[in-house]
């Protein structure tokens, strides 16, 4: 038997642990939306509006588009498909391709849903995957800008959570779930990963852990930085689609990219938004 003070202390400890534990996911009406955001802290799914950028507007990434769409189509039809890692330069269309391809395929596959999970909430993935496992819908789970940053044991625990979710434990991976991650890094390694202070063996073990996470993605698709002709082609495609005519279009587009120090699909789209606003035209 325990004394009253010990019992009270144990109750307080149990209450504190319950507050710290992730909330159990609350199943929404998935018919209400096709895109969702998962809030792991609250255990809630938040409906999001449909993604508006058409798939055919993504130019300069034709090979990447074809590979991703083929894999997604297989998944939506219940055929074997691989989890996907989209890696490469910032602003090259990794996240846009995922959402635009999803919207395109969802028009033909009513049961398809996309759920976005924040990279800081990877610890909730195993629980989320188990929650979705027996649903009739088919889910694309997207983690944008995935990487494992140095921190107090945060790096390897996040990697292990992702691996556990993708592998599915003794139950195996969910058949109705496709995991897609975007990253600037092919092996999801933090830049300047510091071996000093932790010891070479511990640092090497961390590195092996992170590389083993990338190996869980059966399909790797790289996105190189845009060259100038591809960037201008993207600008012209956007301008033609939205009826934005300008004799000095190329010159202005190049000035825009030079001011930002980058050429990418994102920069091209930002230029078009600026041009449309200048002309008083809605996109």
Features from the language model and the residues they span:
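AAA+/P-loop NTPase substrate/partner-engagement loops
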Residues: 104-139, 148-153
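Interdomain "pre-motor" coupling segment immediately N-terminal to P-loop NTPase/helicase cores
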Residues: 2-46
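Phosphate-binding P-loop
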Residues: 47-49, 73-81
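Walker A/P-loop nucleotide-binding motif
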Residues: 78-100
């Amino acid at each position: 038997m325990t004394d009253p003070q010990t019992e009270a202390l144990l109750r307080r400890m149990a209450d504190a642990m319950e507050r710290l534990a992730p909330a159990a996911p609350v199943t929404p009406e998935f018919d209400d939306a096709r895109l969702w955001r998962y809030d792991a802290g609250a255990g809630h799914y938040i409906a999001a509006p449909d993604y508006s950028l058409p798939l055919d507007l993504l130019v300069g990434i034709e090979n990447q588009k074809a590979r991703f769409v083929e894999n997604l189509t297989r998944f939506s039809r219940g055929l074997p498909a691989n989890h996907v890692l989209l890696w490469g330069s910032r602003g090259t269309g990794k996240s846009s391709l995922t959402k635009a391809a999803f919207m395109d395929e969802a028009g033909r596959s009513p049961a398809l849903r996309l759920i976005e999970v924040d990279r800081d909430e990877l610890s909730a993935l195993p629980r989320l995957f188990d929650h979705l496992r027996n649903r009739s819908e088919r889910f694309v789970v997207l983690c944008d800008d995935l990487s494992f940053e140095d921190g107090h044991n945060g790096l390897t625990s996040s990697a292990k959570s992702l691996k556990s979710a993708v592998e599915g434990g003794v139950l195996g991976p969910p058949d109705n779930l496709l995991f897609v991650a975007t990253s600037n890094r092919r092996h999801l390694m933090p830049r300047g990963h510091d071996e000093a202070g932790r010891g070479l063996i511990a640092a090497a073990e961390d590195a092996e852990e992170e590389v083993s996470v990338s190996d869980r993605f059966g399909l790797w698709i790289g996105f190189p930085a845009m060259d100038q002709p591809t960037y201008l082609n993207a600008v012209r495609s956007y301008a033609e689609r939205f009826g934005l005519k300008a004799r000095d279009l190329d010159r202005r587009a190049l000035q825009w990219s030079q001011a930002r120090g980058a050429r990418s699909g994102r920069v091209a789209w930002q230029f078009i938004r600026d041009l449309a606003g200048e002309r008083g035209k809605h996109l």
